[in-house]
């Protein structure tokens, strides 16, 4: 299963040392190029930079082939939604209210960092039972 992530879910999970849960729950995590840029910005936490030095198995960076400039969102949310559509992702991980609403309007399954993980999309792994 492919899931595309916006910046905030990755930031939060890195901050609490739980980033490895994403590929265990969802399989392949696609990180948009604009999200990668935010994760390694000058003011990014050091934990982000250490993690990005060697991107673990289960994570890959991709650029969207086309960005919908009509989406009134920041660059990372826009690219996450467009990439999720292009890759026919099972879900998009996004926390911001406006981005979540637009993703849902476009027919995407939306998962947030906390609340929506009760039933991850098509999760078949036994890891979920451990949470």
What is the role of each PLM region?
Residues 35-36, 100-131:
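Acidic, PIN/NYN-like endoribonuclease modules and their adjacent C-terminal/linker elements
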Residues 1-91, 97, 104-108:
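Active-site-proximal, substrate-binding regions of enzyme catalytic domains
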